[in-house]
Amino acid sequence: MGKQSPIILAVTNKELRDQLSEENRKIMGAPERMDPFYGAPVILVVLANKAIPTHVYDGSLVMGNLMNAAESLGVANIWIHRAKEEFESDFGKNIFADLGIEGEYEGIGHCALGYAVEPAKKAAPRKEDYVYYIR
């Protein structure tokens, strides 16, 4: 017990937020000046300790919980990938060093938070064979 592997970097510093965006954009192969974080001012980076066998599951659950909590508060949010690649690079390793974070952490995802410019669209219909009932 007590072996929760995830940590969260709550990034509100605009300079670091923009650096994360640029690194993410490069990994994505997107055109210059494209913002993978859709202009969101707050980025919660979820990472998990590789020493724990369930670290990817643990980090994914944190991401889902962050997104559900944000939605319940009326805060727009989106899961942005490529945290793994960011934090395997020298760029990410330097962030760990600057923060004094030791250990081997894998980037799970970015939870970008902000307020939507327009209301959310109606959800698409769900696939029919999503749940199988066993009675």
What name fits each language-model region?
Residues M1-R135:
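Acidic, surface-exposed loops and disordered segments
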